[in-house]
Design a protein with these regions (language model features):
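Well-ordered alpha/beta subsegment
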Residues: 140-165
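Sec-dependent signal peptide recognition
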Residues: 2-10
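Extracytoplasmic
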Residues: 46-48, 68, 112, 121, ...
Length: 165
């Protein structure tokens, strides 16, 4: 008798589990058919926001990263160009204090020549060599190599003007 009751309980459990599984499948099917893919397709075809950076007589463009720090930085620049006195630090970057703080998305990264980095939320750096630390990458300068960037940034202080295209 106990065996039959156990057998019936097991059958009921299997039946309950299989009906739950079916109820979970049904709601996900319509979601998969929603037109979200067209929205993401249009987002993928949008051109990325570009920064313009002028150092001495040279103009660069830089592609913004996709993070809240880069978005806040670009939004700030829509109010007008920002010119900073940048000084050399460690023979691998130019750094300047920002007029305000920005949100941080720090993570361990390896920088390379052309990286524009937010440091501690209130400084911006242009890297012309490598470094590794917890940083927030704001952008990368397009089509520039280490040697060319070192020539343009040179030794000592430079004035850099940041704007959005």
């Amino acid at each position: 008798m106990k065996g039959r009751i156990l057998y019936i309980v097991i059958l009921l459990l299997f039946a309950a589990c299989s009906s739950d599984a079916a109820s979970f499948v049904k709601p996900t099917q319509p979601e998969a058919q929603t037109p979200k893919s067209s929205a993401s397709s249009s987002a993928q075809t949008e051109a990325p926001v570009k920064l313009k950076i002028h150092v001495n007589d040279t103009a660069f463009t830089a592609t913004l990263e996709e993070n809240s720090s880069a978005k806040a930085f670009a939004e700030f620049l829509t109010q007008g160009d920002m010119t900073l006195d940048m000084h050399d630090y460690g023979s691998f970057e130019k750094v300047a204090d920002l007029p305000r703080s920005f949100p941080r998305n720090d993570k361990q990264i390896d920088t390379d020549a052309g990286d524009i980095i937010l440091y501690q939320g209130n400084s911006v750096t242009i890297y012309y060599d490598k470094n590794s630390w917890n940083f927030t990458r704001l952008a990368r300068i397009d089509n520039v190599n280490k040697k060319r960037l070192q020539q343009i940034l040179g030794k000592g202080n430079v004035k850099a003007t940041f704007s959005v295209e």
